[in-house]
A protein has these predicted regions:
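Extracytosolic ligand-binding ectodomains
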Residues: 1-159
């Protein structure tokens, strides 16, 4: 709201923007509930869920990697969300489950605080997004774009 007030609501009315979003599901619900209980606050702040996922993806990739060199961790990141892998979510119990699967040599499919995420061949991540707009001086969510729709949009842009 500092931006809207600083610029003046009359100048930004009906402006649109995009941000990362959370796609509804069990891992998102578990993260939001745990965050609320721990901090007595809503987890919908800028970067809260994406930063959590970044740390989790890195920690899981470090455990998947054959060694802790940059190239090995980089290559392991793609295997954090393996199609057909055993689903793992957020929180300590799910992290422990993921580590047990990794140690057993089984693939995992992480769905985090953001929801499902995927890495392409270049290591770029795709995930859900939201479109926000300024309406009567307030920032409101216009719509959420799920992972599948974001991937289709990315393919259209790339082609």
């Amino acid at each position: 709201m500092d931006f809207v007030n600083g610029v003046g609501a009359q100048f930004v009315e009906d402006f649109f923007g995009m941000d990362n979003a959370q796609e509804p599901g069990p891992s998102v619900d578990a993260f939001n509930d745990a965050f609320q209980k721990k901090w007595n606050a809503d987890s919908k702040g800028p970067g809260v869920h994406t930063q959590y996922d970044a740390v989790m993806v890195l920690a899981l990739a470090m455990n998947i990697a054959k060694d802790l060199t940059g190239p090995s961790i980089r290559d392991a990141i793609r295997r954090v969300h393996t199609p057909g892998g055993t689903p793992v979510g957020t929180g300590p119990a799910e992290f422990k489950k993921a580590l047990e699967l990794i140690r057993a040599g089984r693939p995992i499919k992480y769905s985090g605080a953001t929801g499902p995420i995927e890495f392409d061949a270049n290591g770029d991540v795709s995930g859900p997004a939201l479109v926000w707009k300024i309406n009567n001086g307030q920032i409101v969510t216009d719509r959420t774009i799920g992972l599948t729709e974001m991937q289709a949009l990315t393919r259209r842009i790339e082609n």
